[in-house]
């Protein structure tokens, strides 16, 4: 279940099929940055949508362009920051929480995985202040999601908390509107 792509390498990246991604990349390095005809996603964006670290790492080693945008004008960083727990993740966390806190450790592991993904993209030179079709940066999305793990990473990479989206809101405005006082304080210190 999920998204169906017209480009086989995009579908393989979305489904975490490293073998298929490797085969397509081996055939021609052009496939590493191919854009799907339906929504413009690249294999890197597809892998970031699902948080597939091995695929992202492989594509980055093959020099995938981290700054390519899809039809919504989003980069892989937008999707990495927007990545949430899946329904299955929540189900496992809830079921395993009473069992020796396994659910808690699963939650921490997934959060660390997402942090690692964002770090990889930042280290690869992704434009941290890139805006999508609505004027949102990755920092806007991190603030909306109250992601206190990723916000310091983005700020350290020089994300600008004062960039306004098409609704006239900056990341700081979003944090204040949603009453996320700790995040608002972080953003004020950075600006």
Swiss-Prot record:
> What InterPro entries does the record tag this protein with?
Ankyrin_rpt, Ankyrin_rpt-contain_sf, ANR22
ANK repeat residues: 39-68, 72-100, 101-130, 134-163
Q: What are the protein's UniProt keywords?
A: ANK repeat, Repeat
Q: Which domain of life is it from?
A: Eukaryota
- Keyword Repeat present in the record's keywords: the answer is yes
* Pfam families with a match to the protein in the record: Ank_2 (PF12796)
Entry keyword annotation includes Transmembrane helix: no
Q: What is this protein identified as?
A: Ankyrin repeat domain-containing protein 22
Provide the organism lineage as a comma list.
Answer: Eukaryota, Metazoa, Chordata, Craniata, Vertebrata
């Amino acid at each position: 279940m999920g998204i169906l792509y017209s480009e086989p390498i995009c579908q393989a990246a979305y489904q975490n099929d490293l073998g298929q991604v490797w085969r397509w990349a081996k055939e021609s390095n052009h496939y590493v940055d191919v854009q799907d005809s339906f929504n413009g996603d690249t294999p890197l964006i597809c892998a970031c949508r699902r948080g597939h670290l091995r695929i992202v790492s492989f594509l980055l080693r093959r020099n995938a362009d981290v700054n390519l945008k899809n039809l919504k004008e989003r980069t892989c960083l937008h999707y990495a920051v927007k990545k949430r727990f899946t329904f299955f993740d929540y189900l496992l966390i809830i079921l395993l929480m009473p069992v020796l806190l396994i659910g808690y450790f699963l939650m921490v592991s997934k959060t660390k995985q997402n942090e690692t993904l964002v770090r990889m993209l930042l280290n690869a030179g992704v434009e941290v202040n890139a805006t999508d079709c609505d004027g949102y940066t990755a920092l806007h999305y991190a603030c909306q999601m109250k992601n206190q793990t990723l916000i310091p990473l983005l700020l350290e990479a020089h994300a600008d908390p004062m960039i306004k989206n098409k609704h006239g809101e900056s990341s700081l405005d979003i944090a204040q509107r949603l009453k996320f006082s700790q995040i608002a304080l972080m953003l004020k210190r950075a600006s």
